[in-house]
Amino acid sequence: MAMRTKILIGRRRALAALGALPLARLAAAVDIEQQRTGGPYVPTPQVVVDEMLRMAKVGAGDFVIDLGSGDGIIVLTAAQKHKARGFGVDIDPELVKLSNNEAKKRGLADRAAFHVMDVHKTDLSKASVLTLYLLPGMMLDLRQKVFSELKPGTRVVSHDYSFGDEWLPDDQYTWDVPEKEKVNGVPRATVYLWIIPAKVAGRWRLDLAAPASSRYDLTLKQRFQSLEGTAAGGGTKPVRLTHSRLTGEDITFALPAAGDYHLFKGKVSGEKMEGGVQLAGGKGVARWTATRVKS
């Protein structure tokens, strides 16, 4: 996978026109263009590829999509070492041709393919793993698309650049990679991991089974994997959820009760949630279910 610079004729003409600008304005304009297109082609070291796939726990059942695939190394490695399937997209026809030829050479053409395509127009819905190595501006441009199109539980891994402060990674790892110094002057790499959370924002009706036997109306607000909300039940004033968290389809939150709190853990499945709750005051456990209230 690699950061990309668009090489189509229209872009070449645009960059040629930039030549008439003063040096400072030219540098700023080129930087904006690289942020928009993802950046120049920079090969990803094999050691970084291996770490990205390790953090994503890629296996034989996975479908990997690589945005800005460059020489194809991530999808090729996923197919060869981990028996996964997938495809990469890039706007450089020559790199796409090179990647497809390499897939054929390695006997991987039935599991690894590469396409000339704009990352913004790529259908991400098949991915169980998404990989990226794009400049910060492009990462921010793609953030909402990634969140909206990928299924809950999909793993997203990025080399060096994140989705910004609003969507913090679920995990990250930084280590020394001396061979990178020759490329960008920095002998280190950082790999970020996100697990796409279920979409739970809205109103829910929660039923708590015996021995607690009660009903709550939940109102949830979500910003990526961050969750907050309120619960009302039994004629009492709404109380705020605490200890709330989304990790893929897993949801955790707590509700104040009798000077303590009920701790809920469960799974989200579309319009329903269910799981177990540790009751306040050590009074045992109970099952709970919740159904989305349609407006």
Predicted segments — roles?
Residues 28-59:
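Class I SAM-dependent transferase core
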Residues 100-122:
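S-adenosyl-L-methionine
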Residues 2-22:
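N-terminal secretory signal peptides and thylakoid transit peptides that target proteins
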Residues 61-68:
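Conserved class I S-adenosyl-L-methionine
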Residues 198-295:
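Central antiparallel beta-sheet cores of small beta-barrel/beta-sandwich binding domains
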Residues 162-203:
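Active-site capping/gating segments
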Residues 72-76:
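Glycine-rich SAM-binding Motif I of class I
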Residues 85-90:
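Conserved SAM-binding motif I beta-strand of class I
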